[in-house]
Design a protein with these regions (language model features):
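A short, N-terminal "cap"/entry segment at the start of jelly-roll beta-barrel domains
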Residues: 1-44, 124-147
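Conserved short histidine dyad/triad with adjacent acidic residue
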Residues: 29-62, 92-96
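Residues that flank catalytic or metal-binding motifs in active/ligand-binding sites
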Residues: 33, 67, 104
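Short, well-ordered beta-strand segments in beta-rich or mixed alpha/beta enzyme
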Residues: 49-52, 71-74, 99, 109-110
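Glycine- and acidic-residue-biased ligand/ion/polar-headgroup-sensing regions
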Residues: 54, 63-78
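Short acidic-glycine-tyrosine-enriched beta hairpin
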Residues: 77-101
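Ligand-binding loop in jelly-roll beta-barrel domains
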Residues: 93-122
Length: 147
């Protein structure tokens, strides 16, 4: 029986997102690296693999969209206690986090539905969103091509 309507994508540029296992990590500091998996310009969502070496401290931040985290390996100290390899956490829109510390070398999958806003006692210090993640990926590709 034929389909009652045309189900082809309305936009021909729609495609899957594929990141190979051997794609290089983007080093952000001596203790922190990321691998960009997916960025959605349409929704503002993004997904990354994050690797923190033992002792890395992520600054205080607020989630301006829900986020999912799944620890692949390692251990993190978070406001609610300790997350271990195999743990999953959902962080709702609006949640505040104090500093998060890598108690061991840690790798985790992070999927975010918006902006993460960083702050200290006095002011906002920065943010991460789909645009900053996309720029991070583009700059890494340019740097790799220049090598």
């Amino acid at each position: 029986m034929p389909l009652p309507q045309d189900i082809r994508p309305a936009f021909q540029h729609i495609q899957d997102s594929l990141v190979r296992a051997d794609e290089p990590w983007i080093v952000q500091s001596p203790l922190a690296s990321r691998k960009v998996l997916w960025v959605s310009r349409e929704s503002g969502s993004w997904a990354v693999l994050i690797h923190w070496k033992k002792g890395y401290v992520a600054p205080a931040h607020k989630h301006l969209g829900g986020a999912h985290a799944y620890l692949i390996s390692g251990k993190l100290q978070v406001r609610d206690g300790v997350l271990n390899a195999g743990d999953y956490v959902y962080e709702p829109n609006g949640v505040l986090h104090d500093a998060t510390t890598a108690l061991e070398d840690t790798t985790y999958l992070f999927i975010c539905d918006g902006t993460v806003l960083y702050f200290n006692e006095d002011s906002f210090t920065g943010y991460t969103n789909w645009e900053t993640i996309e720029k991070l990926r583009e700059n890494a590709k340019l740097a790799q091509a220049a090598e």
